[in-house]
Amino acid sequence: MIQTAAKDTCFSPRQTLCCPGGRLLDLRQPQVMGILNLTPDSFFADSRVASQANHTDLLRRAETMLKAGAAVLDLGAYSSRPGAEDISAAEEQQRMLPALQALRAAFPEAFLSVDTFRASVAEEAVAAGADIINDISGGTLDEAMFATIGRLRVPYVLMHMRGTPQTMAQHTDYATDMVVELVRYFRDKLVAIRAAGIVDVVLDPGFGFAKTPAQSHELLRRLGELQVLGLPVLAGLSRKGLVYKPLGLTPEEALPGTIALNAIALLNGAKLLRVHDVAEAVQTVQLVSQTYPAPTP
């Protein structure tokens, strides 16, 4: 268990993200991030957006998510499922940039996040209208990422993962307490992040990334221990193996379980839920917040 006092945190508590154009994303109350996958091999087939020159399917799905209450749309062009195909930066950009430009033109006030571990893709994405960079590798797969984000001055989602999407399933052995290792990992990364000039950071413990379902359940149970770091926490649980595998189900059958685990994440301090099913997640946030209202600052 983590015993560190609040005075020992790396950052002062910060629950508002400053996005390009001076727009503020307020995470004092939990928010929902909707997933839009541009990949043909994402683990949940219904999350895959059809590839179209006019982006009709993408814009329709985005509008549905925003109307349902999504605060952020997270656009991904590189599949991070276990064993996913590795694609080049050029192909990732080719998938990403036209779709991102279409989203920004259609929804100028929406908060748009781009899921990438490549600094070159992040730079092009911000130029095309992205507000947030969501990096599954925490800067480990591209040493230029931190300096790039610091220069771009955009919020950064720092995730924990070992290995790569292709090898992470082989890296589930933790020499010591897993959650303690995660806190140490984040602390070390945050030192480098501060040195790079990055101000706004969200922590993602990486459910399912180099973690077995049992380890992910332990992490969820102890998610509140990450609050010693003083930063908002993102929970990405939606339809993952830790939801459906213990139940003998498929990702397509995992919505009820996702709702249950999202509620647990909220009760343990999560401020951002990354989900495929926005309406259900928004209702979960509303009901948990109604039952357990946040203290007035």
Residue ranges of each PLM-predicted region?
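Hydrophobic "anchor" residues on beta-strands that sit immediately upstream
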Residues: 33, 70, 111, 131, ...
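Short beta-strands and strand-loop turn motifs
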Residues: 39, 73-77, 159-160, 202-207
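Hydrophobic residues within beta-strands of alpha/beta enzymes
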Residues: 65, 73, 133, 201, ...
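N-terminal glycine-rich anion-binding loops that anchor highly charged ligand groups
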Residues: 25-38, 66-76
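Short, well-ordered coil/turn residues at beta-beta hairpins
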Residues: 35, 135-136, 205
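Active-site-adjacent loop and "lid" segments of alpha/beta metabolic enzymes
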Residues: 2-13, 18-21, 27, 42-61, ...
